[in-house]
Structure formats: structure tokens, C-alpha cells
């Protein structure tokens, strides 16, 4: 099981970029457009669709993965992996323990948590979700994690195209038509194709 515990602090595409793509003139004061609220809702919707389609995290966000037991090689979903914040487990007595970082290594290239040399995993109680791994994922840009230059340009282009499709079909969106029914845009899929993660978590 996996859950996102912290959403991205901002979006890969700004309102100004979306306006430019949609050819919406800023006509209000301060510079605004009557559809700004709608576009601001469509941007995260488009980003989430593209993240789900590729199996990636675009901007820095926090995830938790819950496992029934430790494994020697644990691949973390929704790459790229930035860092592992903590690993907790339920011991044989039923108490929650924090695992020392000396027991494992983190490979941010392959998005994996590995057992460190000479170490052994602690015993866990035989219950569901006995192990919880909390980690940061997303395109990291050092001191400025929300710097959009860390996002591949093809992904930004796909999000903008998705925003455009959602905006053009906003009546269908409001009527509840699903993205999968509406999104036949082969260009979006072609742009995202190189960034898709396979079912084993490989990139």
C-alpha cells in the first residue's frame, strides 16, 4: 500500500504559462482573466493525470509505502527518489520501532532501499503493513526544490497540452467524463512515453 502524505508545494506549470498556451489575455486588474480560477484547477488535475500515467512524481512530495515485511531489495514507487526520511516497523512485541539508517542504504538512481553490507533486517510481527517507509520523491533542484527547471521540458509540454484539452472540453469535464475517455491525445502520450515507469518500478 502507498499513500501520498504531502502534496507538491507548487505546480510545474504556472498560471501565466497556461494562459499563454491557451491564448487567454489578462484583462482584469491586477492582470487576470475570468477563467483564471478554472485554469488554476485544471493545472493540478493535468499534472496528477500525467504523474499517474508515467508513474512518477514531478515536484517534491512525500510518500509512504507500507509492506508486510522487510525485503533485501525494496523498490520505491513514484520516482525519482530524493531521500528516505524514515523506516519504521512493528516488532515482535507489537511496538513501533524506528530503524537505524545504518542498517540500509538508499540508491536514488534505481529508487531502491537495500540491506547494508553485514546487516540483517529486524524481525517484525506477522501483521499487515508491518513496515512503513517514508520518503521524498520528485525532480530535485537542490536548494530550490520547486524550481521548474528540474522538470523535463517534455513533461511540462505534456501538462500544458493536457490543460488545453481539459479547457477545450471543460463542459465534458464538469459533466464527469473521465480523463481516460477524453484523453486520446497521442502527442501527450508520446511526450510522456520516455518517462514511464514499468510495472517493476524501473525507469
Model feature map: region roles:
Residues 1-203:
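Divalent metal-cofactor coordination and adjacent catalytic microenvironments
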